[in-house]
């Protein structure tokens, strides 16, 4: 699995409201979260499809 997918979900420090997806290593699924718009980490994908492709979800 891509190491970025193992990072914890991080909403970032800003207060915007961007719908994004992250890989949840507990459920082994990509799940939606609201990204604040700055900082955060690499476990942050624009689409469910991108998250599933990068993180190998079947």
UniProtKB/Swiss-Prot annotation:
UniProt-listed CDD domains: Kunitz_actitoxin-like
- State the source organism's domain of life: Eukaryota
Q: What is this protein called?
A: KappaPI-actitoxin-Avd3b
Cellular-component GO terms for this entry: extracellular space; nematocyst
The free-text function statement in the UniProt record for this protein reads: Dual-function toxin that inhibits both the serine protease trypsin (Kd<30 nM) and voltage-gated potassium channels Kv1.2/KCNA2 (IC(50)=2800 nM).
Keywords in alphabetical order, please. Answer: Disulfide bond, Ion channel impairing toxin, Nematocyst, Potassium channel impairing toxin, Protease inhibitor, Secreted, Serine protease inhibitor, Toxin, Voltage-gated potassium channel impairing toxin
Domain BPTI/Kunitz inhibitor: where?
5-55
Q: Write down the position(s) of the site called Reactive bond for trypsin.
A: 15-16
Indicate yes or no for the key word Disulfide bond: yes
Q: Where in the cell is it found?
A: Secreted; Nematocyst
One Pfam family assigned to this protein is Kunitz_BPTI
Which cysteines in this chain are paired by disulphide bridges?
A: 5-55, 14-38, 30-51
Protein's UniProt keywords contain Secreted: yes
Q: Per the UniProt entry, what species is this protein from, by scientific name? A: Anemonia sulcata (Mediterranean snakelocks sea anemone)
Family assignment from sequence similarity: Belongs to the venom Kunitz-type family. Sea anemone type 2 potassium channel toxin subfamily.
SUPFAM superfamilies found in the cross-reference section? BPTI-like
- Recorded GO MF terms: potassium channel regulator activity; serine-type endopeptidase inhibitor activity; toxin activity
Q: What is its main location?
A: secreted
């Amino acid at each position: 699995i891509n190491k970025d997918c193992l990072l914890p979900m991080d909403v970032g420090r800003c207060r915007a409201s961007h719908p994004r997806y992250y890989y949840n290593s507990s459920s082994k699924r990509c799940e939606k979260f609201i990204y604040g718009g700055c900082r955060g980490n690499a476990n942050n994908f624009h689409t469910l499809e991108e998250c599933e492709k990068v993180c190998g979800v079947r």
